[in-house]
A protein has these predicted regions:
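Flexible hinge/switch segments at interdomain interfaces of large molecular machines
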Residues: 14-15
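Flexible, glycine-rich terminal cap/loop adjacent to redox cofactors
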Residues: 6-11, 20, 25-136
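Conserved core segment of the aminotransferase class I/II
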Residues: 1-5
């Protein structure tokens, strides 16, 4: 769509390929966006990581799907640069993190978003809070 709009309207927009979500529809689902922790380690890039396990989520307990995790990586300036998710409905949860990577949002700001309780999306909030040692 970006290429078509550029051609038709004379725009010069670019695509941020790091913000394109990756989804695998297996059981459990797997999804990610941005850089992976392995890439950061291999490149020697300084980063921070927050992690949250599905087994600690009330909604995961209610639906009987306790396996999985959400991992969020930031750079030294607290900008969200990547996320890896494994678990129930993580392909649906990825949108918020794709937005954060695409717009260069800070983890502290995204962590202020109120998430419904009980919901699987609370895991996103908790993983982000874990980056700052504020996980419940």
């Amino acid at each position: 769509m970006v290429a078509a709009a550029n051609a038709v309207k004379g725009n010069s927009e670019t695509v941020n390929y790091k913000a394109i979500p990756s989804c695998v529809y297996t059981e459990p689902e797997v999804s990610g966006v941005g850089v992976t922790e392995d890439e950061l380690k291999a490149n020697g890039t300084p980063y921070h990581v927050g992690r949250f396990e599905f087994r600690a989520l009330g909604k995961a307990k209610a639906i009987g799907k306790l396996q999985g995790f959400i991992k969020v990586m930031t750079d030294e300036d607290d900008t969200i640069i990547g996320a890896s998710l494994v678990g129930p409905h993580v392909t649906d949860l990825l949108t918020e993190l794709s937005l954060a990577v695409g717009l260069g949002l800070k983890a502290k700001d995204v962590g202020k978003v109120i998430h419904a309780h009980p919901s699987l999306s609370e895991g996103l909030m908790e993983a982000i809070h874990d980056i700052h040692g504020e996980c419940v």
